[in-house]
Amino acid sequence: MVTIRADEISNIIRERIEQYNREVKIVNTGTVLQVGDGIARIHGLDEVMAGELVEFEEGTIGIALNLESNNVGVVLMGDGLTIQEGSSVKATGRIAQIPVSEAYLGRVINALAKPIDGRGEISASESRLIESPAPGIISRRSVYEPLQTGLIAIDSMIPIGRGQRELIIGDRQTGKAAVATDTILNQKGQNVVCVYVAIGQKASSVAQVVTTFQERGAMEYTIVVAETADSPATLQYLAPYTGAALAEYFMYRERHTSIIYDDLSKQAQAYRQMSLLLRRPPGREAYPGDVFYLHSRLLERAAKLSSPLGEGSMTALPIVETQSGDVSAYIPTNVISITDGQIFLSADLFNAGIRPAINVGISVSRVGSAAQIKAMKQVAGKSKLELAQFAELEAFAQFASDLDKATQNQLARGQRLRELLKQSQAAPLTVEEQIVTIYTGANGYLDPLEIGQVKKFLVQLRTYLKTNKPQLQEIISSTKTFTEEVEALLKEAIPEQIELFLLQEQT
């Protein structure tokens, strides 16, 4: 028979008591009352904060947006098909944040910063809040460096500076995304990090943009954040903030960044859907009352930082789609009032074969010539006025039968100026090439040519100057001014090339 030793038993009990670790954990929980259409109503969660992340029993994450007296309205970051009525929900005590690092360059990610390009996980040691406060007044300085888009019409007449917010607005299929993607292609070698945010786009068009970037070597300095048309409204609403958080990470590390939101109309629609399902009162065009704040807090994050903060910059190029040219609708007027200018793309110009279809008359940059190098100011200073006068004269000339010689000359000059602003897609020009092109048109050298010959001649002229007069490019890029030496070189080269071109065309 086994003998029971009292001292041994007491030792074991004592050891167990010493090892006992009482862990007290307070968890803020609730139960699902109702779920559907990407919205869940939760009973409980008494201590939850506005904007806090909550986790459902089966792993779905949501954001608490509506805090009501008897329930909490949560928007889901997923389809929520496996969430059941009565299942439990717990508050996480965190607000939405994403990992950030250099490793994101060249990758395609979703609004939660998870890779969707099939190239494995992205390593990151730091994280940033998706919603960060914008830099204050003291943290900023005025915009003074140009961000070259490679498009003559923009860089000469509607210049964009680093740290500016310039709206690209127009009807569907007028080339808005083409202007934005060309700007990204033109940043090659400029040490600018680009972020392209696709909101509610077709997956095929996002894939096309990514392919273009890869073929042109632009992906190495670009991050693509994509939430396509089949994504939940919550993720389409979050995508721009995710892009802004990534761009901010580089801006605060003394880098220049450029971010494109394509497009904010779809983000506003996603937010409207969420708000109406949460039963928030609708306002104008059924958008909620805080839709202005939705965009202002996003676009205010673009800035040119002051010297103590390292002079980094974040340039925002939001895109907004209009319905049959109506710029006075709710979202377009909101975004126009927030940004520092707009580039208006016209369907009529696009259909008339003027591409990029920029309506120079009503497009404006509120930073102006501060965002141009001196050489461009010297050459293109009067271009916008001349084109506006030409457009007015052209409209008037339709009703007049016999025009005097001076008017005919002005019309001919204007037509050639408009012709030199035409550019093929994905063919950005360097600032030196743009200066030469504008100088040629503004000084009447193109007048002897037929309108149809202008584009062909300019290509030939640029090629000739690149190979035979490389010092021209060197002088402009080193001095940033249009010197007398440059003008002398052009006065000699352009007439020669025009003679040669006209002889070639005759044969």
Curated annotation (Swiss-Prot):
EC numbers, comma separated: 7.1.2.2
Any Pfam family: ATP-synt_ab
Broadest EC class assigned to this enzyme: translocase
Assembly behavior: F-type ATPases have 2 components, CF(1) - the catalytic core - and CF(0) - the membrane proton channel. CF(1) has five subunits: alpha(3), beta(3), gamma(1), delta(1), epsilon(1). CF(0) has four main subunits: a, b, b' and c.
Main function: Produces ATP from ADP in the presence of a proton gradient across the membrane. The alpha chain is a regulatory subunit.
Organism listed in the record: Calycanthus floridus var. glaucus (Eastern sweetshrub)
Enzymatic reactions: ATP + H2O + 4 H(+)(in) = ADP + phosphate + 5 H(+)(out)
Keyword Transferase among record annotations: no
Gene that this sequence comes from: atpA
PANTHER family: ATP SYNTHASE SUBUNIT ALPHA, MITOCHONDRIAL
Site (Required for activity): 363
Domain of life of the organism encoding this protein: Eukaryota
Protein localization: Plastid, Chloroplast thylakoid membrane
UniProt protein name: ATP synthase subunit alpha, chloroplastic
Family, per entry: Belongs to the ATPase alpha/beta chains family.
Residue intervals passing through the bilayer: none
CDD domains assigned to the protein according to its UniProt record, in alphabetical order: ATP-synt_F1_alpha_C (cd18113), ATP-synt_F1_alpha_N (cd18116), F1-ATPase_alpha_CD (cd01132)
Any one Gene Ontology molecular-function term assigned to this protein's record: ADP binding
Gene3D superfamilies recorded: 2.40.30.20, ATP synthase alpha/beta chain, C-terminal domain, P-loop containing nucleotide triphosphate hydrolases
Membrane-protein topology: Peripheral membrane protein
Keywords linked to the UniProt accession: ATP synthesis, ATP-binding, CF(1), Chloroplast, Hydrogen ion transport, Ion transport, Membrane, Nucleotide-binding, Plastid, Thylakoid, Translocase, Transport
